[in-house]
């Protein structure tokens, strides 16, 4: 089995979408998409040649970084240190050894600093506002509606209301009430 790393993924990408994209190159044994933090995935191909074909075809497509996973070369242990083999680890952003992509100073155009509490700052739906809940854990009471009923009738438009075709109207145009005043025409 050959493991492939896919980086720079949209946080909303699903395992099914990746499977559909990569299965054209060969038999997939496993697809795993990271959720915390999002943005990368690992796929396992049955045959190394299929994995290499997928890498050559899909690397840099859609902005993705697709390459062989380095976990196949010796696993996690053996390197010592606090992270186990950090000296042998290759950064997926810049390609250099000795640090991870989240610590890369050259990746994505700027230095990325970790805040002390990233979970508090980031909403679970990645940027969309969430509704606040009152301190007691309940939602605040619904807003009261206005006591005055909504106005019905003529709008505030300056144009007269639509009355249909003029041919169908029995009213005369010279009087706003549809009949003549007895005082019109000097009577």
UniProtKB/Swiss-Prot annotation:
Residue numbers bearing the Phosphoserine modification: 123, 132, 134, 140, 146, 159, 181
Region span, Disordered: 68-89, 105-187
Protein name: Serine/arginine-rich splicing factor RSZ21
Family annotation (PROSITE patterns): RRM, ZF_CCHC
Ranges of Basic and acidic residues composition bias in the record: 165-177
Molecular function per GO: identical protein binding; mRNA binding; zinc ion binding
Pfam family, one: zf-CCHC
Location of this chain's protein in the cell: Nucleus speckle
């Amino acid at each position: 089995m050959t493991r492939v790393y896919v980086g720079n993924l949209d946080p909303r990408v699903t395992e099914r979408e990746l499977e559909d994209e990569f299965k054209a190159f060969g038999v997939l044994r496993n697809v795993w998409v990271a959720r915390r933090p999002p943005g990368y995935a690992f796929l396992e191909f049955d045959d190394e040649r299929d994995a290499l074909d997928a890498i050559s075809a899909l690397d840099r497509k859609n902005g993705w970084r697709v390459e062989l996973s380095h976990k196949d070369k010796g696993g996690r242990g053996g390197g010592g240190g606090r992270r186990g083999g950090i000296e042998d680890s290759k950064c997926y952003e810049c390609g250099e050894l000795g640090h991870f992509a989240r610590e890369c100073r050259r990746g994505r155009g700027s230095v990325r600093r970790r805040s002390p509490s990233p979970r508090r700052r980031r909403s679970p739906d990645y940027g969309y506002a969430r509704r606040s809940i009152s301190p007691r854990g309940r939602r605040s009471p619904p807003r009261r509606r206005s006591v005055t009923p909504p106005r019905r009738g003529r709008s505030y438009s300056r144009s007269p209301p639509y009355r249909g075709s003029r041919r169908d109207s029995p009213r005369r145009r010279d009087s706003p009430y549809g009949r003549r005043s007895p005082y019109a025409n000097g009577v």
